[in-house]
Swiss-Prot record:
A motif (Endocytosis signal) lies at residues 14-15. Disulfide bonds join 242-372, 245-256, 273-366, 345-358. One of its GO terms (molecular function) is pattern recognition receptor activity. It comes from Gorilla gorilla gorilla. This is C-type lectin domain family 4 member M. Signal peptide: none annotated. Keywords: Adaptive immunity, Calcium, Disulfide bond, Endocytosis, Glycoprotein, Immunity, Innate immunity, Lectin, Mannose-binding, Membrane, Metal-binding, Receptor, Repeat, Signal-anchor, Transmembrane, Transmembrane helix. Probable pathogen-recognition receptor involved in peripheral immune surveillance in liver. May mediate the endocytosis of pathogens which are subsequently degraded in lysosomal compartments. Probably recognizes in a calcium-dependent manner high mannose N-linked oligosaccharides in a variety of pathogen antigens. Is a receptor for ICAM3, probably by binding to mannose-like carbohydrates. CDD domains: CLECT_DC-SIGN_like (cd03590). Residues 1-49 are cytoplasmic. Ca(2+) binds at residues 336, 338, 340, 343, 354-355. The chain crosses the membrane at residues 50-70. Sequence repeats lie at residues 108-130, 131-153, 154-176, 177-199, 200-222, 223-245. Glycans are attached at residues 92, 338.
Length: 376
C-alpha cells in the first residue's frame, strides 16, 4: 500500500508554478494533465462568443422591427389626411352644386330675360350711325354745290327733289320733330323758287344746315333710309350738273386737294399751287389735319404744307398770312420744330409735322374751294 502511494506523492511533487504566467503551467512531465486543462479553457471562450453573437442578432432584429412599426404608424396618419382632404372637396362640390341649382330658378331666368328684353329695346332705338354720317357728308357736299348753282332750270330740278324729300319727311311719326323739319323745308322750297340772287343761295345754305341738324335727331330707321334714298337721288341730280373737284383732286369738307406725284422745294411748291389757282395747303381745323395726315402717312411721303417761319425766326405763319394757332402746336413731332440747320419750312412727316430746309425737294399739297367743274 505504501509503495503505491509514494509514487503518487512524487508525481504531485513534480508540479511547479511558473512565476511568469497568471495561470498554471505544466512541465512536460505532466503533459497529459496540461492538455485536459487547456481543453476546458477553450470550450469556455467559445461559449461566450456565441452568446455575444446571439445578443447582436437580437439587437439588429429589434431595430428592424422598430423601424417597420414607425413606418406602419405613419400610414394611418397619411390616410387620415387624404380622407380629410376628400371630405373638404366633397363639401365644396356639394355647396357648388347647391349654388348652381339656384341659378336655374324661374325668378332668376325671368330677371335675365327682362334685362335682355330691355337691352334689345334700347339697341333697337339707336339710330344707324353709319347712315347718319353718310347723310351728313351728302348734305355737306350738297351745301357746297348749291352755293355755286345759278341756272334756274337746274334749280327747278332741285326744287322737285326737295319736294319729294318733304313728302317723305311728312310721313315720319314723331310729330314735334316733323313739324320742325316741315317748316324748314317750307322755307327751303320758297327760297329755291327765287334762286338767282346770291343772298337766296346763302339762305338755302342756312336752311340745309338746320335741316341737317334736325335729321340727326330722327330715330326711325326705315324713315331714315327713305330720306337717305331721296338725298341720293338729289346727289345724282347735282352730279349731272357738275363735278365738285377737277380730275386727280380729292374732295373733303367743301375743298379740293391735290397731292403731287413729283417733288419740288418749298418755294417752287408754292408757285406750282398758284399756277392752278390754288394755295399750298393751309390747315384750318383738326378734322382737316387728320384727313391730310392720313393721306401722307398712307403714301409714306414727306409733303410740304403752306407753313414757314421765313419772315421771323420762331414765328410760324401760313402762306395766307394767318399765324399758326396755339392749338395746332400739338401736331409737331417730338422735339420739333428744332431749326436744325436753318429749317424754316414745315412738312408732313410720319404721324406729325417737322421743320426742314426750304431748299429740300418734297412732294406738296395744294388746296382750293370747290366750284362747278363741267366736263368738256
Amino acid at each position: 500500500m505504501s509503495d503505491s502511494k509514494e509514487p503518487r506523492v512524487q508525481q504531485l511533487g513534480l508540479l511547479e508554478e511558473d512565476p511568469t504566467t497568471s495561470g498554471i503551467r505544466l512541465f512536460p512531465r505532466d503533459f497529459q494533465f496540461q492538455q485536459i486543462h487547456g481543453h476546458k479553457s477553450s470550450t469556455g471562450c467559445l461559449g461566450h462568443g456565441a452568446l455575444v453573437l446571439q445578443l447582436l442578432s437580437f439587437t439588429l432584429l429589434a431595430g428592424v422591427l422598430v423601424a417597420i412599426l414607425v413606418q406602419v404608424s405613419k400610414v394611418p396618419s397619411s390616410l387620415s389626411q387624404e380622407q380629410s382632404e376628400q371630405d373638404a372637396i366633397y363639401q365644396n362640390l356639394t355647396q357648388l352644386k347647391a349654388a348652381v341649382g339656384e341659378l336655374s330658378e324661374k325668378s332668376k331666368l325671368q330677371e335675365i330675360y327682362q334685362e335682355l328684353t330691355q337691352l334689345k329695346a334700347a339697341v333697337g332705338e339707336l339710330p344707324e350711325k353709319s347712315k347718319l354720317q353718310e347723310i351728313y357728308q351728302e348734305l355737306t357736299q350738297l351745301k357746297a354745290a348749291v352755293g355755286e348753282l345759278p341756272e334756274k332750270s337746274k334749280l327747278q330740278e332741285i326744287y322737285q327733289e326737295l319736294t319729294q324729300l318733304k313728302a317723305a319727311v311728312g310721313e315720319l311719326p314723331e310729330k314735334s320733330k316733323l313739324q320742325e323739319i316741315y317748316q324748314e323745308l317750307t322755307r327751303l322750297k320758297a327760297a329755291v323758287g327765287e334762286l338767282p340772287e346770291k343772298s337766296k343761295l346763302q339762305e338755302i345754305y342756312q336752311e340745309l344746315t338746320q335741316l341737317k341738324a334736325a335729321l340727326g335727331k330722327l330715330p326711325d330707321q326705315s324713315k331714315q333710309q327713305q330720306i337717305y334714298q331721296e338725298l341720293t337721288d338729289l346727289k345724282t341730280a347735282f352730279e349731272r350738273l357738275c363735278r365738285h373737284c377737277p380730275k386727280d383732286w380729292t374732295f373733303f369738307q367743301g375743298n379740293c386737294y391735290f397731292m403731287s406725284n413729283s417733288q419740288r422745294n418749298w418755294h417752287n411748291s408754292v408757285t406750282a399751287c398758284q399756277e392752278v389757282r390754288a394755295q399750298l395747303v393751309v390747315i384750318k381745323s383738326a378734322e382737316e389735319q387728320n384727313f391730310l395726315q392720313l393721306q401722307t402717312s398712307r403714301s409714306n411721303r414727306f409733303s410740304w404744307m403752306g407753313l414757314s417761319d421765313l419772315n421771323q425766326e420762331g414765328t410760324w405763319q401760313w402762306v395766307d398770312g394767318s399765324p399758326l394757332s396755339p392749338s395746332f402746336q400739338r401736331y409737331w413731332n417730338s422735339g420739333e420744330p428744332n431749326n436744325s440747320g436753318n429749317e424754316d419750312c414745315a412738312e408732313f412727316s410720319g404721324s406729325g409735322w417737322n421743320d426742314n430746309r426750304c431748299d429740300v425737294d418734297n412732294y406738296w399739297i395744294c388746296k382750293k374751294p370747290t366750284v362747278c367743274f363741267r366736263d368738256e
